[in-house]
């Protein structure tokens, strides 16, 4: 589960491009963004580690900067209209 600090960190990074994002998207629940290039915009904000998938649905493993001395990995399932972010904390 994301801490309050990391939740704000991720939300702020995403809202740089999207303006406003429903909080459920940051809790591992789907959020409709209606952005055709949502995956690319996320890629612009986070370092891409792995891409698994095709041109329509992709699974990304992203790593943020250090947050409270932890590395946060985010598995991101996304298509044109939905994003599902699942946080994985690596001590």
From Swiss-Prot:
Top-level taxon of origin: Viruses
Stated name of the protein: Putative protein p22
Lineage: Viruses, Duplodnaviria, Heunggongvirae, Uroviricota, Caudoviricetes
């Amino acid at each position: 589960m994301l801490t309050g600090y990391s939740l704000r960190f991720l939300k702020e990074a995403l809202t740089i491009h999207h303006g406003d994002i429903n909080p459920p998207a940051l809790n591992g629940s789907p959020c409709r963004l209606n952005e055709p290039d949502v995956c690319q915009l996320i890629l612009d904000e986070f370092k891409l580690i792995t891409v698994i998938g095709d041109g329509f649905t992709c699974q990304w493993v992203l790593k943020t900067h250090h947050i409270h001395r932890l590395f946060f990995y985010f598995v991101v399932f996304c298509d044109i209209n939905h994003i599902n972010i699942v946080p994985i904390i690596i001590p």
